[in-house]
Amino acid sequence: MGSDLPTLPASPDRLLRVRKLAKRYVRGGVWGKRVPVIAVDGVDLEIAGGQTLALVGESGSGKSTVARCVARLEKPDSGQIWIGEKDVGDLSSSSRLPLRSAVQMVFQDPVTSMNPRFTAVEVVEEPLLIQGLDRERRRKVALESIDEVGLLRAWADRSVMQFSGGQRQRLAIARALMLRPKLLVLDEAITGLDLSAQAQIANLLQALQTSHSLTYLLISHDLALVTRMADAIAVMAGGRIVETGPTSQMMMAPKEQETIRLLASARAAQSRLGALTEASA
């Protein structure tokens, strides 16, 4: 990973390319002994511009670590992350500013990334502070983004804590769009919402993908959401990608045992949820 951003062979149809990505942590063990943990071990993946890749796997498989490395919230130990033709895997803090514009992340719980003392418009306009825009211009652009995600401008000066979970996720998406990114990393961004809100946010993300030519890296364990949104699926286990392919192929004819087991487990969980929902109706 070079800090001088080497120009690589053109790949106009691939917005994100990850090669041999590795990340390790050191955690406390028995008797205070430090134990190395391999979170990501030589991951390769790529996403064509305007497409959605779903990265799936059990808890602890390494998928969220990959997401955080792509967004540069974590520094990889080795490997390359290319956005377009640039290797951005080892950027310094000062060189990372352009990447923040190109790649934005939307988390599962938006409250953790929002100042509870801020109003909705202040939360959304926050990324523009680093751009040096004046307050009037920031507010204008933020209000336009609030409109675009389906919230009312009349609510712009309410505290973010007055919004529901689904509405706060809309605000998080509006904020992510402020720097006109090319790639959105969606880390369980719809998990935890009720079914109605999940469907609405999924519809919104698909509409925004079309209108803004966005590319998505979708981290999810929700089989229905993955089937609906993803063009391709990559399955992780033990820090590695064990299988990848088009969504229809992966759902209908998975080849690896880990994929077969994961899909069977997800389908069983959905069947139980459906039965509980029907019983409580």
Predicted feature locations:
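Conserved ABC ATPase signature
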Residues: 159-163, 167
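Helix-to-loop junction immediately C-terminal to a conserved catalytic motif
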Residues: 71
